[in-house]
Amino acid sequence: YTGWSFCTNMANVTAQQGGNLILNNFFGVLLTTAYGLANQVSGILYGFVTNFQMAFRPQIVKLYASELVDDLWELVLKASRISFYLLLFIAVPSIVNIDFFFSIWLKQVPDYSTTFCTLIIIYCLIDSIQAPLWMTIDATGKIKAYSIWLTCILVFNLPLSYIILKLGGPPSTFLVVRVVLNLITAIVRTIYMKFFIGFPIRIYCKMVLKCCVVLVISFLLSYLLKCLLDNLELSKILSVLSSLII
């Protein structure tokens, strides 16, 4: 268990830190700075939901060990939904008003910082709704096949990004590839849960679809308020409130 878990963690670190090497190689230090800024935003977002997610992890392990399958799936679905909405509460206003926040935070904003941070927020949203699933897989102790699949997908990020950038792709290529591969790992993880643990994938997909609808409506409403209101400060407040209400 420890060895396979280590492989997955190393693949995650390689996928994240490899971005610095690739961006520095193709575009220099300035875009590396923008990527570092995006990673800081990622750390803030993860810190916001991590404490909540860690609170239900022992319960997941307990329910699996007790073979209380129905209660386990109910907890996993509920935890996924709440984790997503908690992060959504700060993700939507952050994306909509990201230029405003940067103007307060930094005197000089590096190029592509807005794009990088938007993509990293999307990445974090995918992770938030998937966290209870990988916690459940960890609780089973049967992670060999899962870790092999996950490691292969995550490490594929670097060569694929390098090839696309070599062919003239934009600087955001690395993070776009990361988001797409994270989505693929989410699909693989969900399918693995279905076939090896009996996870109710149909109910989970319906829940994910509802979350996506809420995300789109929240974003559109927040963006519409931002565009319509003349008072800049008021628009920021209402953007946050609209995401909370929805």
Please give the residue ranges for each predicted region.
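Transmembrane helix-bundle signature of multi-pass secondary active exporters and lipid flippases
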Residues: 8, 12, 35-54, 84-90, ...
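Alpha-helical transmembrane segments of multi-pass membrane proteins
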Residues: 96, 108-133, 145-148, 176, ...
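Interhelical loop/hinge segments that connect adjacent transmembrane helices in multipass membrane
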Residues: 1-16, 55, 59-74, 195-209
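Helix-loop junctions and terminal segments of transmembrane helices
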Residues: 38, 42-80, 87, 134-139
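Alpha-helical transmembrane segments
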Residues: 133-141, 191-206
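Membrane-interface helix-loop junctions in multi-pass transport and translocation proteins
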Residues: 144, 151-187, 194-195, 199-201, ...
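Alpha-helical transmembrane segments of multi-pass membrane transport and lipid-handling proteins
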Residues: 49, 73-128, 155-166, 216-224
